[in-house]
């Protein structure tokens, strides 16, 4: 009877020991499995995040590449407009310098005429279709030439001034049209950039949702 009792106690102790050992081994295996699953999920999440970032980068490059060329084109057009404006200003400045020079020459001619007319000479001039004569001022050929040159200079000055003003007005109109076109292109580009920013923000929100969980 005692042997049976001893065997029962021994079996019970052995069973408890084995059960405890199995329980510990099961807990260890479950902990290892949990760690492996968490590590696999973490690696999978990192890989998915990297793939999404890479895809987003490729999409951004694909979207912004045409607009990059547009931006470069707009910048080049802006530089051309600025260069054209400087050229127009330089041309008008040269025209004004020439006009000033011609005006100075005209003033010198007037001074010469004034000097020559201080000592007026009177003479008898014949009356047209008559044998009678009348008193008139003797006019030298050089004075007549100077008057003709003065009139010619004045006409040239007015013509060149009108030409310069017309050219400047046309150039300013062209620059205004180009500035309007540039403003429209920049507004379109800004709207597209804002739309792409909203898309990236939504993608970031979608990307961060699994991490929050």
Swiss-Prot record:
Database matches in InterPro entries: MbeB-like
Organism domain of life: Bacteria
Keyword terms: Plasmid
Pfam families per the UniProt record, alphabetical: MbeB_N
Miscellaneous section: Plasmid pJD1 is the smallest of the gonococcal plasmids. Its function is unknown.
Full protein name: Cryptic plasmid protein B
Organism (species): Neisseria gonorrhoeae
